[in-house]
Structure formats: structure tokens, C-alpha cells
């Protein structure tokens, strides 16, 4: 993650954070450096750009789910993630806001116990239901704008399958690839994460 922000490597605005940045990029980070690296990176970005940071964390629970069958490894990951997330998301003055997604329901116990002001929205919540994918109107406009209005029902049959709150939405990745490839029907979304913890 740090290597994606190479502009920080010689930033005159980082002060003592420059040493942390270089330790992480050089592979010399301590466990503490790693557990606080997201908070520290957000601070570095604010110092460099002069703006608060938005943190987006997708599949926050992926490594925990993968280690579910190994209690010792699972606990190590839970302990690390508790520090990693709480330092990044609580009391971080460089943070504007954060969005965290995952398979497991976010609970104020466990790894999020250190956080307050936590707003949890799940697939049944109406508040952001239209923001989890493309709506019917958006897909129709996209297809019409790409001279493919006759493909609307086909796209609905293949890629409309999610319901958040009270709205049916399309998988954006699938729709983008479908349109980009000349409306060629295919399974564009590959499930790369494990949901074994839910299956149990």
C-alpha cells in the first residue's frame, strides 16, 4: 500500500513520519509500525496534500475468515486487526471518513470494540441502498448511451441479482465489463473471497 504513494518518499512535509514510511517500504517495519501503518499513512497523506483522507477498506474480514479453522492463527489476526482498524478509525485527526465492507456483520464487540460513532448499514438497510451497485435506470442509460438499447432485458436477466434495502441493483463490475466487451454475455464476477465462516 505504501509503495502506491511514492510521492511521499521524499516529501519535505512528512517530518518524522518519513522514517516510518521508509521503514515500511524497505521491509524493515516493526510489528507496531505495521499495526499502525494505516493511521500513519493517512497522516502522511494529509501532511503532504493538506487534505483529510477517506479510507476505503473492502473485505476487512477476509484474512480472519481464511484463518477461521485455525484458532491460534485466527486470534493473532483478530488482535492485529483490532489495533490496525482502531488506530486508523478512532481518534485519527487526518481521517475525513471511512467505509468498511465485509462478509461478517460488523459488531461493536470483537475487532470494532474500540470504535464509537460507528454506523452499520447492511444489505437490509435502506439508507444507502442505491449506492451498492448500478440501478435499473443507470444500466438502461449506459446501454442506450452505448447504442445497445435492445440489450436491456438481456443485461437484467444476467446481471441484476442483488437487493439492498428496497432496491434491486446490478453488479457494477459485471455491467462495466459486459458493455466494454460489446455486450458479450459472460460471468465477469469471480468470487475471490471465502465465505466458509458463514456457511458453518
Task: Tell what function each PLM region has.
Residues 1-200:
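Phosphate-binding site recognition
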